[in-house]
């Protein structure tokens, strides 16, 4: 067994364990790992079979799905009566109503909808009689005298209490009896079942000024990442604010989907049945049951309901006190005599707790058709309503409180508490067990936390993507679990926070995941190498009428959303920094992290290759070869500039180039100090060739706002900032330093600029030459500015007159000097620059404006003594050029 297969005592993060057995298990019978491994029998504490960047999700699609402020009027879409009792009679309406026009029209939100029972009367003029006015002559009533000192003290006390109180945004109040007022599911009508159709994806949501209008519409998909709502919307006025909307999900064992929509309003519970969906116009025909008014059932507000996944005609409800009941749904809503919802007399009970003050309650079916789960803030209770027994499964009164629960499938559900995300499953005896839990470290006092889950099916496992959101902010906490055979649940080890971009600072009212992801067609052997993850959901913000569609993917889209802000929150320092930032800072942080992710994806393969071959990679040999190639390419560039000198003068083009453009494969090294030493030697050598370079010290000062003596110091200071951003901070910092240096490193030849400047000046007409000649005529200011702003000394790398190698030696093989001498070399360069300003170069022995064809590279292996560098005198001496330039310097050209 290899060392990597032995379980170690690594920190498990916030995971509280795999099941109840332990964090690391030995599995002698089954192998849960991939086929490519050599069948290790150790069950790892987290699922590490996926690639590291497999869960690096970005927003690839953001679109407005619908606006609930736009209201619709529907005239005959609600079926109330029918001559036949069969509930399938209206299911074929889509084949018989091809010529039927649209029955819904868009109404201006300002114009109110007038009910039919409202009658209009003639205009009545109301007289403005004086008896309704205020008598100004009435004397002021007697008031008690209060000393001004007392009033002043009261004002000071009130101001102090106001300043010491919590901000208003923290004092957020919400109605716990209001659940999701938005839902979407696939439904199957009777016609779909007869014709073996998969069904139709619909959306149901509340709208209107009071939220009393139920809207049902069809969702259409162009492809996997584009979702649209059909414009033909069925709207029903319920005359009472809607508090909850649910479209049930049926069990996979019955082989069909439901066609029901359940609604809770302030005074009733009602169920709608979708009878048909027109195949072309997408017209939705619905029928409704009679409202079950709360005055008929103890006059208590019903806060939640659930449908039986195994019996679509059965439902369960629970009120604010914890009283629950089981009921039956009529098979046909089209008969007025059989439209009433019936509660079964002997199937009811209560979990009333006098110590529980919250009216928040939830009810959901469990692992069997006769078992339900009932929740309040402090406990989860399993109830078998057929055998008349119940047991308390979870008690959350001390350490944490229950926040939400969602059903995953017939055997599992996910429970959100104030401190954990818990996957609850059913054992072989259908008893609830705790599969796995993850400590999320969110605000334990936030009672608005909710959770939703999306299942992503893969060939050998299922991914459960959990979204935790709050009505207090716009951040979504995402954590992924994997579900493999034999009820093995594992965490994937890290969490991600996604900031919803745009809009005002507000909370998230609803996140609705869409059940359509199915990747069964992907081959199992390619699942881990080409892993593609796509999740999509609908988002409705608090106090907003717009519903947005989002799609997340771990692959880059052709048009990525620039406002995505995925933040890794496993580091407490980074999470604290992000939470305390304002909106503008968060936008900058999001853009920064997006660039980090993009850079990691672009260079992750090359960086990993460098790490794997770090020992076998000869760094010194690579840098030596890099120096040779850079020197040869520079010599060729200088020769080409000299050959095209006359053409450049006529065209007015300047001779300059980036070092990055001269080389390929210039980043395959890891030592920043040795790279800095290489650049120092390269700059020193080309000082005799009339070539200048940008001074890095001045430019690096702009990044850190402090003096930076070298690249190694710049790297260390950047590293201190990047350790909060990414676990790969060292590698990323090196890549950033390389990018900065190669993007800033430019070479130019100043001797070629003077003829171009003179040519441009001569080409101007008389008036323009006079204007240019009038610039900088003050000799005193000229001298001061010349001393203060000397471009040669501030923005050019100074030169030494000594080449880095002995060119007259035939036997000496040059090697690049170590980085320890770089500081001394820099000091010599500074002194040399100061001496150059006082003593110009002598042109009697050398003229550096012309390069021969036999130019010697800066880094050469062997140099014969006969190849000496010769120079040809230029037509215009360099000293006269400098004197002329100093006498009359033209701004903007020289």
Curated annotation (Swiss-Prot):
Give the record's GO CC terms: cytoplasm; nucleus; RNA polymerase I core factor complex
Signal sequence region: none
- One GO MF term, please? RNA polymerase I transcription regulatory region sequence-specific DNA binding
Q: Which Pfam families match?
A: Rrn6_beta-prop, Rrn6_HB, Rrn6_K-rich
Chief location category:
cytoplasm
Keywords (A to Z) from UniProt: Cytoplasm, Nucleus, Transcription, Transcription regulation
Please give the residue ranges the record annotates as the region Disordered.
803-894
What PANTHER family does the record point to? RNA POLYMERASE I-SPECIFIC TRANSCRIPTION INITIATION FACTOR RRN6 (PTHR28221:SF2)
Q: What does this protein do?
A: Acts as a component of the core factor (CF) complex which is essential for the initiation of rDNA transcription by RNA polymerase I. After binding of UAF (upstream activation factor) to an upstream element of the promoter, CF is recruited in a SPT15/TBP-dependent manner to form a preinitiation complex.
Q: How does it assemble?
A: Component of the core factor (CF) complex, which consists of RRN6, RRN7 and RRN11. The CF heterotrimer may further dimerize to form a hexamer. RRN6 interacts with RRN7, RRN11 and RRN9.
Reproduce the miscellaneous comment text.
Answer: Present with 237 molecules/cell in log phase SD medium.
Can you say what this protein is called? RNA polymerase I-specific transcription initiation factor RRN6
Q: Which organism is it from?
A: Saccharomyces cerevisiae (strain ATCC 204508 / S288c)
């Amino acid at each position: 067994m290899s060392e990597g297969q032995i379980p170690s005592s690594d920190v498990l993060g916030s995971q509280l364990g795999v099941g109840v057995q332990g964090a690391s298990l030995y599995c002698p019978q089954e192998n849960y790992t991939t086929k490519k491994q050599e069948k290790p029998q150790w069950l790892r504490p987290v699922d590490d079979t996926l690639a590291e960047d497999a869960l690096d999700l970005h927003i690839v699609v953001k679109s407005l799905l619908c606006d609930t402020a736009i209201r619709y009027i529907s005239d005959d879409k609600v079926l109330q009566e029918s001559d036949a009792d069969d509930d399938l009679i209206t299911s074929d309406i889509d084949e018989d109503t091809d010529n039927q026009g649209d029955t819904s029209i868009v109404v201006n939100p300002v114009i109110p909808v007038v009910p039919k029972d409202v009658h209009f009367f003639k205009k009545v003029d109301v007289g403005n009689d004086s008896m309704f006015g205020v008598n100004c002559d009435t004397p002021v009533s007697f008031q008690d005298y209060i000393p001004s000192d007392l009033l002043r003290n009261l004002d000071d006390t009130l101001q102090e209490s106001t300043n010491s109180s919590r901000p208003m945004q923290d004092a957020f109040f919400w109605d716990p009896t209001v659940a999701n007022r938005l839902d979407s599911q696939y439904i199957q009508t009777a016609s779909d079942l007869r014709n073996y159709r998969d069904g139709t994806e619909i959306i149901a949501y509340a709208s209107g000024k009071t939220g009393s209008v139920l809207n049902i519409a069809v969702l259409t998909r162009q492809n996997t990442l584009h979702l649209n709502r059909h414009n033909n919307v069925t709207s029903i006025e319920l005359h009472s604010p809607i508090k909850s909307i649910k479209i049930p999900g049926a069990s996979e064992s019955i082989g069909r989907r439901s066609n029901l929509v359940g609604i809770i309003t302030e005074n009733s519970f009602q169920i709608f049945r979708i009878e048909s969906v027109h195949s072309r116009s997408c017209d939705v025909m619905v029928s409704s049951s009679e409202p079950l008014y709360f005055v008929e059932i103890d006059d208590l507000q019903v806060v939640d309901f659930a449908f039986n996944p195994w019996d679509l005609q059965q439902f369960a409800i629970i009120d604010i006190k914890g009283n629950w009941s089981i009921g039956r749904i009529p098979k046909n809503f089209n008969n007025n005599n059989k439209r009433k919802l019936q509660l079964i007399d002997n199937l009811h009970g209560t979990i009333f707790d006098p110590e529980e003050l919250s009216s928040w309650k939830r009810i959901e079916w469990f692992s069997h058709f006769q078992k339900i789960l009932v929740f309040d803030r402090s406990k989860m209770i399993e109830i078998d309503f057929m055998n008349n027994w119940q047991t308390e499964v979870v008690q959350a009164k001390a350490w944490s409180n229950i926040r939400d629960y969602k059903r995953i499938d017939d055997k599992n559900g996910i429970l959100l508490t104030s401190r954990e995300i818990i996957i609850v499953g059913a054992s072989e005896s259908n008893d609830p067990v705790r599969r796995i839990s993850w400590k999320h470290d969110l605000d334990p006092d936030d009672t608005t936390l909710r959770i939703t889950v999306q299942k992503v099916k893969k060939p050998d496992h299922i991914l459960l993507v959990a979204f935790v959101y709050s009505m207090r902010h716009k951040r979504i906490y995402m954590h992924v679990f994997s579900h493999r055979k034999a009820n093995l649940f594992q965490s994937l080890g890290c969490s991600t926070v996604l900031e919803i971009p745009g809009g005002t600072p507000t909370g998230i009212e609803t996140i609705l995941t869409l059940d359509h992801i199915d990747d069964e067609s992907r081959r199992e052997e390619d699942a881990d190498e080409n892993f593609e993850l796509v999740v999509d959901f609908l988002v409705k913000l608090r106090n907003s009428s717009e519903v947005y569609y989002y799609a997340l993917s771990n692959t880059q889209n052709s048009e990525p959303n620039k406002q995505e802000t995925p933040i890794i929150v496993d580091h407490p320092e980074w999470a604290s920094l992000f939470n305390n930032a304002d909106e503008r800072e968060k936008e900058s942080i999001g853009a920064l992290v997006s660039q980090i992710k993009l850079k990691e994806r672009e260079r992750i393969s090359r960086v990993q290759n460098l790490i794997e071959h770090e020992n076998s990679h000869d760094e010194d040999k690579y840098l030596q070869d890099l120096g040779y190639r850079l020197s040869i390419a520079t010599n060729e560039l200088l020769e080409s500039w000299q050959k095209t000198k006359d053409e450049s003068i006529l065209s007015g083009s300047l001779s300059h180039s980036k070092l990055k453009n001269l080389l390929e494969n210039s980043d395959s090294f890891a030592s920043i100090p040795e790279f800095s030493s290489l650049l120092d030697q390269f700059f020193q050598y080309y000082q005799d060739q009339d070539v200048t370079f940008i001074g890095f010290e001045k430019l690096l000062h702009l990044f850190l706002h402090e003096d930076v003596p070298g690249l190694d110091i710049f790297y260390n200071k950047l590293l201190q900032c990047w350790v909060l951003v990414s676990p790969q901070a060292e590698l990323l910092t090196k890549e950033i330093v390389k990018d900065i240096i190669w993007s800033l490193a430019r070479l130019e030849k100043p001797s070629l600029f003077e003829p171009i400047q003179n040519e441009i000046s001569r080409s101007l007409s008389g008036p323009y030459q006079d204007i240019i000649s009038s610039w900088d005529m003050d000799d005193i200011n000229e001298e001061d500015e010349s001393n203060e702003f000397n471009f040669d000394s501030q923005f050019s790398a100074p030169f030494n007159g000594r080449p880095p190698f002995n060119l007259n030696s035939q036997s000496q093989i040059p090697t690049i000097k170590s980085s320890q001498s770089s500081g001394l070399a820099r000091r010599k360069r500074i002194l040399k620059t100061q001496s150059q300003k006082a003593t110009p170069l002598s042109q009697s022995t050398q003229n550096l404006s012309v390069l021969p064809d036999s130019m010697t590279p800066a880094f050469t292996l062997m140099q014969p003594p006969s190849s000496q560098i010769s120079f040809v005198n230029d037509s215009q001496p360099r000293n006269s050029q400098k004197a002329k330039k100093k006498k009359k310097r033209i701004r903007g050209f020289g």
